[in-house]
């Protein structure tokens, strides 16, 4: 009788293990703690001001689900996500938020640090203007609520959002 119970237990455990769902094809990817999932990517806001290059280097340290970069923005919805993340934590009435767009390699040819195509922009009126050799893009918050993009010196320190793709 003990043999029969042991056999039933082994079979039951075996069937239970075989019936576990394989999430690799249907379960949504998960982001690390403190990251926000949206449309196949993970995002995280960092409020400590860094220069553009420092912020990009910090983002590249994150590799939990894909290589991290300063956030690229492909749509108005994604732009609004970043604005919402920023507005929910910012404490000043003016300031900026680094995004992963720059024309450091060639003036006027803006590229995303993650290599994705530039398919959406939200430049403020008269921007980008390259005033005093500005090569890096940030979301600019103005008192009038015009939270749009501006090119600015890469040496300035701003908060930033990192983005990791979950599809790599």
From Swiss-Prot:
Q: Name one GO molecular function term.
A: carbohydrate binding
Q: C-type lectin domain location, by residue?
A: 38-163
- The secretion signal range is 1-18
- What's in the keyword line of the UniProt record? Disulfide bond, Hemagglutinin, Lectin, Signal
InterPro entries linked: C-type_lectin-like (IPR001304), C-type_lectin-like/link_sf (IPR016186), C-type_lectin/snaclec_domain (IPR050111), C-type_lectin_CS (IPR018378), CEL1-like_CTLD (IPR033988), CTDL_fold (IPR016187)
Q: List the disulfide bonds.
A: 59-162, 136-154
**Does the record carry Repeat as a key word?**
no
Pfam families found in the cross-reference section:
Lectin_C
State the oligomer form and interacting partners: Monomer, homodimer and homooligomer.
User: What biological function has been recorded for the protein in this entry?
Assistant: Alpha-N-acetylgalactosamine-specific lectin. The oligomeric form has Ca(2+)-dependent hemagglutination activity towards sheep erythrocytes. Its hemagglutination activity is inhibited by various monosaccharides, oligosaccharides and glycopeptides, including inhibition by GalNAc, blood group A trisaccharide, Tn antigen, mucin and asialomucin.
Indicate what this protein is called per its UniProt record.
Alpha-N-acetylgalactosamine-specific lectin
State the species of origin.
Patiria pectinifera
**What lineage does UniProt assign to this protein's organism?**
Eukaryota, Metazoa, Echinodermata, Eleutherozoa, Asterozoa
């Amino acid at each position: 009788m003990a043999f029969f119970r042991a056999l039933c237990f082994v079979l039951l455990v075996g069937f239970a293990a075989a019936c576990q769902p394989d999430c690799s094809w249907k379960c949504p990817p998960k982001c690390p703690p403190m990251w926000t999932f949206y449309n196949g990517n993970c995002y995280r806001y960092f409020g400590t001001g860094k220069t553009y290059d420092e912020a990009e280097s910090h983002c590249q340290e994150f590799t939990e689900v894909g290589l991290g970069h300063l956030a690229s923005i492909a749509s108005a919805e994604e732009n609004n996500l970043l604005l919402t993340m920023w507005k929910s934590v910012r404490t000043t009435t003016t300031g900026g938020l680094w995004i992963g767009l720059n024309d450091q390699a060639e003036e006027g040819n803006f590229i995303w640090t993650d290599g994705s195509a530039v398919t959406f922009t939200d430049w403020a009126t008269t921007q980008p203007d390259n005033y005093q050799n500005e090569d890096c893009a940030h979301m600019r918050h103005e008192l009038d609520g015009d939270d749009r993009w501006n090119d600015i010196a890469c040496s300035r320190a701003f908060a930033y959002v990192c983005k990791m793709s979950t599809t790599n």
